[in-house]
């Protein structure tokens, strides 16, 4: 029956809906690892870098291009960040690319990402993360920088960087405790263990948890609601709600990340991950 409905164009890509959300990127964005789509006053940034939507320098550049395009538009009120891969949201940073950069390169990368995420947080544009499955490491940090996080029931969140001998570099040591409290954030960051969508909701990391097949409709419903709000009021609510020492905390995280990233343990953790073996950390 499903094959027949797809053949008839009543389900699947031809129908415009499919069994899971399907990106319809604007011209010029078809080959980008992050694709831009617009629906009325809503922009959608589709993470589309197979196989795992891993965050590489190219993905960071693409996210920045999307944000510059969206924030420069007078019509866009909401940005939804979603995955074009139905099996995951974002598995984290591209570990292989880490082997090609030194401590200075790592610092430049974190500067770029933090600059982007802080721009998102300071903007009058509301941001929504539609987390359909795995959101680990940088993927979790990207979601945390959004104003609203809608999670599918099968989603999971985690900060596994410590298993590589490094620390979260995109805000995980700062935004996570602000969202779920210091004790739970320390547990996640020190163990690297993921949590379920339901736990994320109970902790305060996810605003809503919905059945997988309702995720996209729910995210769009939130987006349409937020797009009707006054942009100046949105910006000031976001600004006042985030008042505090987040910038100082992020600066401390950036310095700590660069220091740890250049360590022998970090090289061992990354190498062990790529070689699919357990790391042997020596405290150096």
What are these regions (language model features)?
Residues 28-82, 86, 104, 118:
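Conserved CoA-thioester-binding segment of acyl-CoA-metabolizing enzymes
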Residues 83-118, 135, 165:
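Glycine- (often His-adjacent) and acidic-residue-rich active-site loop
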Residues 116-164, 194:
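Glycine-rich beta-to-alpha active-site loop
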Residues 150-155, 197, 206-252, 258-264, ...:
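C-terminal long alpha-helix characteristic of the crotonase
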Residues 92-93, 176, 184-190:
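Short helix- or helix-capping micro-motifs
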Residues 192-199:
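Acidic, divalent-metal-coordinating active-site segment for phosphoryl/phosphodiester hydrolysis
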Residues 1-39, 57, 268-270, 275:
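NAD(P)-dependent Rossmann-like dehydrogenase/reductase catalytic/cofactor-binding core
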């Amino acid at each position: 029956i499903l094959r027949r409905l797809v053949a008839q164009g009543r389900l699947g890509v031809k129908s415009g809906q499919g069994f899971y959300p399907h990106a319809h990127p604007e011209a010029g964005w078809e080959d980008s690892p992050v694709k831009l789509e617009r629906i009325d006053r809503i922009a959608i940034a589709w993470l589309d870098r197979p196989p795992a939507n891993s965050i590489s320098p190219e993905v960071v550049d693409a996210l920045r291009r999307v944000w510059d395009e969206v924030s420069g538009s007078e019509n866009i009120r909401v940005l939804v960040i979603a995955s074009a891969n139905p099996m995951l949201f974002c598995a984290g940073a591209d570990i292989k690319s880490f082997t090609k950069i030194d401590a200075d390169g790592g610092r430049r990368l974190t500067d770029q990402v933090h600059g982007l995420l802080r721009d998102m947080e300071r903007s009058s544009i509301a941001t929504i993360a539609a987390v359909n499955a795995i959101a680990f490491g940088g993927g979790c940090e990207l979601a945390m920088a959004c104003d609203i996080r809608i999670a599918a029931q099968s989603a999971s969140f985690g900060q596994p960087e410590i298993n590589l001998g490094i620390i979260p570099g995109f805000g995980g040591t700062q935004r996570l405790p602000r969202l779920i409290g210091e004790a739970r954030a320390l547990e996640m960051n020190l163990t690297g263990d993921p949590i379920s969508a339901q736990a994320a909701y109970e902790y305060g990391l996810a605003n809503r948890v919905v059945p997988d097949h309702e995720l996209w409709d729910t995210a769009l419903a939130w987006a349409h609601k937020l797009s009707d709000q006054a942009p100046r009021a949105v910006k000031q609510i976001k600004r006042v709600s985030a008042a505090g020492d987040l910038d100082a905390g992020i600066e401390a995280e950036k310095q700590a990340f660069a220091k740890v990233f250049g360590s022998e343990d970090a090289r061992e953790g990354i190498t062990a991950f790529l070689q699919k073996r357990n790391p042997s950390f020596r405290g150096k």
